[in-house]
A protein has these predicted regions:
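Glycine- and charged-residue-rich phosphate/anionic-cofactor binding loop of Rossmann-like
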Residues: 32-35, 272-275, 293-312
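Beta-loop-alpha module in the N-terminal Rossmann-like domain of NAD(P)-dependent dehydrogenases
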Residues: 51-115
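Predominantly a Rossmann-like dinucleotide-binding segment in NAD(P)-dependent oxidoreductases
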Residues: 129-211
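Contiguous beta-strand/loop segments that form the cofactor/metal-binding neighborhood of enzyme cores
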Residues: 177, 183-264, 284-299, 317-320, ...
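N-terminal Rossmann-like dinucleotide-binding module
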Residues: 1-52
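Glycine-centered short loops/turns at secondary-structure junctions
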Residues: 93, 120, 227, 326-327
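Rossmann-fold dehydrogenase core element
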Residues: 111-128, 146-152
């Protein structure tokens, strides 16, 4: 079978450190060809094109789509830079891998989802956590238990390192930009989310890193369609706390408390599954699954196709909308339909449209 011809739009941090290395073993095996890279930075194109052996490079995605024959394209852009990349790919029958968050505009994401569905192409949103072996273990355990409650804890340490991921109007805040990974993972465990209520806390001016313009603490409550209730807590105030951080999911079932982390699963305090830290192995597993689905022309092979993943997007954009409505309980159906919207251009919780 010929190599799958893949293009990349966006050569930022996640492409360079996760997706390109994740695909590299498939390139070396002859299963994948890096046909074309596209980025506005000619320096990035020259450096990464040489490092990963791209056959062609472009600064204009229109030209790339016009000149190259692609089987699939990775779209790894900040959410506010999504324009017509998915539309063009769908029109041409090209499979799409879209890094999260796929948009800050729910209406836009719904439109893209409809285009993908009409075209019948393979799609995947970059939720690699579903590909951890520990996630597989939890899914199996839950098939034999009755879950009642789930808790997500995401406590970040250190300073923000990228401009757009530190601006509320550019990334939607840490809950949208990063905690969405864990929100999607618990959806993998428990199914879709039905309702959301949230409260956020902002540091005052001068209390944190100057470049960070977004809420610093997020406290979100969910009700799942299956009846399970949950909470998700995210904190960005451990700026100078060394390595102090936490990233975990706790699922409380009848007579069973399951604790998930990247490399370990515990049940009632006992380790029941553990593996060595795999680094970015989940990205490689996700890449293998995506390429296999593209080769087979089978969208159902993916764990996070674009359409179903909109529930994860609605869950985090809905949290923002609830927080800016004093914690009002909102229906995710209303978020996805556009009846209730969050406007990323305004930071109502802080009283100003944007902070310079």
């Amino acid at each position: 079978m010929p190599a799958t011809r893949i293009g990349f739009i966006g050569l930022g941090h996640i492409s360079i450190h996760a997706h390109l290395p994740g695909l590299q073993p498939l390139v070396e095996a002859g299963d994948v060809e890096f046909t074309a890279f596209c980025d506005i930075s000619e320096e990035a194109l020259a450096t990464q094109g040489a490092a990963f052996g791209a056959r062609a490079t472009y600064t204009d995605h229109y030209e790339m789509f016009e000149r190259e024959k692609l089987d699939a394209v990775y779209i790894n852009l900040p959410p506010t830079l999504h324009t017509d990349q998915i539309t063009i790919a769908a029109d041409k029958g090209i499979g799409v891998f879209v890094e999260k968050p796929v948009s800050l505009d729910m209406d836009q994401a719904v439109e893209f989802s409809q285009q993908i569905h009409r075209a019948g192409i393979v799609s995947q949103v970059g939720f690699m956590s579903r590909y951890y072996s520990t996630a597989d273990k939890v899914v199996k355990m839950l098939s034999e238990r009755t879950p009642r409650h789930v808790q997500i804890a995401m406590f970040y340490s250190g300073k923000p390192v990228r401009w757009w991921t530190s601006r509320y109007e550019e990334c939607g805040g840490s809950f949208v930009e990063n905690t969405i990974h864990m929100v999607d993972l618990v959806r993998h465990f428990l199914g879709d989310i039905a309702d959301v209520s949230a409260f956020y806390h902002w540091r005052a001016r001068g209390e944190g890193p100057e470049m960070m313009n977004m809420p610093h603490v997020y406290d979100v409550n969910y009700r799942f369609a299956c009846g399970v209730v949950g909470s998700a807590i995210t904190s960005r105030v451990l700026t100078d706390a060394g390595d102090a951080s936490r990233r975990e999911v706790i699922l409380v079932c009848d007579d069973s408390m399951i604790e998930w982390s990247v490399n370990r699963v515990m049940d009632n305090g006992e380790t029941v599954f553990e593996e060595q830290v795999q680094g970015r192995a989940a990205f490689a597993l996700q890449a293998q699954a995506f390429v296999a689905a593209v080769k087979a022309g089978d969208p159902s092979m993916m764990r996070s196709p674009y359409g179903p993943s909109l529930n994860s997007l609605a869950a985090v954009l809905g949290a923002n909308a609830s927080a800016e409505r004093a914690g009002e309980r909102l229906s995710l159906a209303d978020i996805q339909s556009g009846k209730v919207a969050w406007n990323p251009r305004f930071c109502a919780g802080h009283g100003t449209p944007t902070l310079d």
